[in-house]
Amino acid sequence: MFARIACSPSGKGVRQVQPIAIRGARVHNLKGVDCDLPRNSLVVITGPSGSGKSSLAFDTLYAEGQRRYVESLSAYARQFLDQLEKPDVDSVSGLSPAIAIEQRTTSSHPRSTVGTVTEIYDHLRVLFAGVGRPHCPRCGEPVTARTAAEIADAILETAGEAPVSVLAPVARGRKGAFRKELDALRAAGYHRVRVDGSAFDLDEAVPLDPRRNHRIEVLVDRLAARPASRRRLIASLERALDLAQGVVLVTIAGEERLHSRTLACARCDVSVAELSPRAFSFNSAYGACPACQGLGWRWRVDADKVIPDAQRPLGDGAIHPWQSHGSAAVREALEDVAARHGFSLDQPLAALPRPGRRALLTGDSQFQGILPHLMGRAEKMLALADGPEPDREAFENLRPYLSETECASCHGARLRPESLAVRLGGRSIADYARLTIAEAAPALRAIPFADRERPVADRILPDVIERLGFLERVGVGYLTLDRSTPTLSAGEAHRVRLAGQIGARLQGIVYVLDEPSVGLHQRDNERLLGTLMAIRDLGNTVVVVEHDAQTIRAADYVVDLGEGAGRQGGTVMYQGPPATLNGSLTGRYLRGELRVPVPSARRAGTGTLRILGAREHNLRGIDVTIPLGTLTVVSGVSGSGKSTLVDDILFRALAAGLGRKTAAPGRHQALEGASAVEDVVAIDQRPIGRTPRSNPATYTGALGAIREMFSLVPEARARGYRSGRFSFNVKGGRCEACQGDGVRPIRMHFLPDAHVRCDACKGRRYNRETLEVLYHGRTIADVLDLTVDEAENVLGAHPRLRRLLATLSAVGLGYLRLGQSAVTLSGGEAQRVKLARELGRRDTGRTVYILDEPTTGLHVDDVARLLQVLSRLVDAGNTVVAVEHNLDVIKSADYVIDLGPEAGAGGGRVVACGTPEAVARSRRSHTARYLRAVLRGDPAEGAA
């Protein structure tokens, strides 16, 4: 059976191998799941959101593989590794080593780059340390360490039979009379010296001014450059090198050449340390630029952020940092500088004379200046960054007034001058890091390695070239290696992480991937599928949690979970090849029996927002119109500039216009029409909380209403319990044995910490007295254990709770328990909880909602429900702008802005815009090709 199922699409069979057999999996909502996954195959686990896909793939399959590997190590090694709990499963057989690549936010640390995440930069550091060619950081001349024999051979090779003088530079640019040194040279038998370019006999008085810098060179030998004189030349060079501490000056027919037997520039007297990988690390003090500590940029106070409105009177809150915190002393200092320079605080900055403006911003002899004052405070806070919490908070208060500016010392290269002066193929390591992925491989192949360098290069470069090739094959060849990972889109970040994990061409591995299609255009997804199949063909098992129809159809084997979510899920509805996936909800969408309908009409909008001259990152100075009161989708191939346009420019510009503290908007000329917007809300996929105490009830505010409801129960009122009694975060009503966690950790040292149910409260978080208060026969612990759908029936009489619960259910989260820990939620679930909270608020009807890939983690049936929710927002007079690749969402939009045509430097332009039908007619748009099919009603090409 499995030999047939595991056949590759080309028809080539695979040898009979034991499947990965999972028996009795009961993790989370799995109901004793049994399934057999064929080895050396592309396996897709699909099903409705919340049906248990991640529980099976990650919390069972990967967790068991990782646990077995860690337990095979010594007790000493295990204490340094993260260890997963043993999954609740009867058995897993046929399992080989497992690697998980989850769908999560990439590192937000500015030191993280594409090169470091993929380890390409680490390989380059080793390469440069092994065969890099040092140059002087001052004059740029090559720096080599040569023996006297090597120097002699170089002289004989180039000098012909010209006369050669060997001199020892005993003093270079030093002050002094040097009497002792000259006497010692005379006693050693030397007769001639050259001082500041003039020759003198040591037997005569040498005129030296002790107040001036001098150059003193001792003549060691003068001879003709003949092969017969080689031995004498070597001996003379060795004497000169000893006299001058490793440096010798050779004149050949009047031309001077400095040589050194250490890594030092003889001309500039600059020594270079022995090369090591850490010398090229911007995360190490040995390699990082001392000015910026390896960041490539430094903070500076931005005058435009400090005084954003140059037409507002200075004394009327124009100076933003001092709007609410300006003291009387600050006011007095400003009045003094105004009096000295002839202006008034009733004037705006724009009306000040140039000297007065300069004095106000940068200071004069009596006033420090606003910008230096704020910069001094920021630097003090940065210096205390490892200190008490208030210092970090103070820096965060200043951060909205700071901008990043390129480091003037390293010009963004992050490294010390000595490290940047090491070259290979005429380039520094920073030069290679600035290349795009597509440019880097040819540049590295073209390096002319010497024969002695080739063995080192041959051990390092193949792996680098392989990883670069993988990145190019999955469509991110336009990224540079030094691109900071916080600036990557979700799709770019996921593919970069993929390269870091699977670019090494391992074999016999079980790869477990979480929605690799997220953030990918359909064209890019085809490339990714080709790569996953190539990994499978190497002899690996690729297990993918996925909703994408393209991926499901391309699979060798499908496991479909359902039939619903949460407690209604956790059952295998189907397992086998995709061709016979019929009866389930997923199968009906795949065959086209069910589909998301195309709207019968498109909204025209109630006004417009216009972004003019957008040129951040790869945007090409484009003008973009967004109709208000519509669902607008920004589409385009991955890396075309969608997130830059929507997140970096639109959201930040609207937020700044509303007076919010935010990062500086991306470069653009103007944003027109913003006066029609009363609020802007970005709903992203970041976690709603980072501790087990945070949950959907606390985040949406439902817990506050539940606590208030319990405090009004007659029993609670009789006991004097207020709403705070029903909080598990504070003393009073919570169980003090576990401090409201419901579990207690047991330190296991060489094994993972075990968490056992609290004996005192039996996992219910509250003390006995609090749990004696009942609402319709349920304790507050019982209520928090209800799913959203169950809670609607129990708590529906409460108006505020009814609205909050209805919105959670409407966004497809009816299966979540109210008290479910936030750390267990996926990025897509977290985003929908945030969306539900926004829906539960009473808005003005003039809000712009910005969503980034809202269909992440959604089955196509859930996408249909999400579209209904977004339509409700728009029908209330709001505007929804979504960055999205899902074709069901694109076809349901009122207006589409398609960017491209390609990624990176080949993108950043508006390829097509208008209704989905208008965009589908474009011949330049990659999106149009796929959009035409779904508008015709062809079987699903998007999610399933």
Regions found by a protein language model. Give the residues of each.
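Conserved phosphate-binding elements of NTP-dependent enzyme cores
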Residues: 1-944
